[in-house]
Amino acid sequence: MKIEELIAIRRDLHRIPELGFQEFKTQQYLLNVLEQYPQDRIEIEKWRTGLFVKVNGTAPEKMLAYRADIDALSIEEQTGLPFASEHHGNMHACGHDLHMTIALGIIDHFVHHPVKHDLLFLFQPAEEGPGGAEPMLESDVLKKWQPDFITALHIAPELPVGTIATKSGLLFANTSELVIDLEGKGGHAAYPHLAEDMVVAASTLVTQLQTIISRNTDPLDSAVITVGTITGGSAQNIIAETAHLEGTIRTLSEESMKQVKERIEDVVKGIEIGFRCKGKVTYPSVYHQVYNTSGLTEEFMSFVAEHQLATVIEAKEAMTGEDFGYMLKKYPGFMFWLGADSEHGLHHAKLNPDENAIETAVHVMTGYFSVYAN
């Protein structure tokens, strides 16, 4: 498949962004592309709104897997591109449209240039939430198609096209969604002494949560608590009875995650006492760290560099969350960053990756699989 064809596919996918486990149009689009290939070369299995696609090897003794996430974000696109989102309020602001396109490019290559071993492609829904990797790993499909190895990539807007970045060991952080609900006694704004103000309680809570990082976390460790949204109150002259906070926790170790959560519970108990209210803490979605398999990762980096498939950079750990970590917990493999050179970063309404990154990724992965799947 030529790069022009892949870019056209990417733009089609960019127009139809869908949220986690709602990727019905996306799934059908992928099927329309894949069903053009000879069915003796590929096998397709639907899984919820995702897909498993096996490219049959000539004399398979093992199976190498590649994962591409397919969901979008609840963001109103502001790129002004002629192929901008047609689903208002949703946007491919994390590059998953490129991820899918790259996977299709790799599949196309190996349908026409078979290798010895089987290749399995996982088009995974709901990476952004509520988390598609764990349930996908439990599917019946993976009971008959068991990978020996798995890999994935993620675009990096801050890196130039033609580069990849990765490292052995920890690449992405442990992440957890955080939801806190406060409930007190509302009242008239003229009589604050007769009420318990949950907006003030929530404001105090936000500042106290940050002391967990500055005063309870080892300075040589890394942890981040972000409160992204606060809602509370119904009118300007009514003291709020409830407040709702949502955010994330990110750490570089599971022990730090445990400690941070314990301290959050303590801080919320203090708010309950101080503001005579009730607090409830929940963690709706938790993502395991992405930990690249030693040996395989270095081998991949050396291969790409030696064959000049891309410029290879030694990555640093990132506080990014990725449910691909669950797949690496079950199978050996690695993940890497793909340079995509965009002025605006991931999850930004103006993210506009350089589409030439698609060709780089297809070149890297077809070169790698051509050797390691033979």
UniProtKB/Swiss-Prot annotation:
Organism for this UniProt entry: Bacillus subtilis (strain 168)
Catalytic EC class: hydrolase
Protein name: N-acetyldiaminopimelate deacetylase
UniProt entry keywords in alphabetical sequence: Amino-acid biosynthesis, Diaminopimelate biosynthesis, Hydrolase, Lysine biosynthesis
The enzyme's E.C. designation: 3.5.1.47
Catalytic residues as annotated in Swiss-Prot or TrEMBL: 69, 128 (proton acceptor)
Protein family per UniProt: Belongs to the peptidase M20A family. N-acetyldiaminopimelate deacetylase subfamily.
UniProt-listed PANTHER family: N-ACETYLDIAMINOPIMELATE DEACETYLASE, PEPTIDASE M20 FAMILY MEMBER
UniProt keyword annotation of Chloroplast present: no
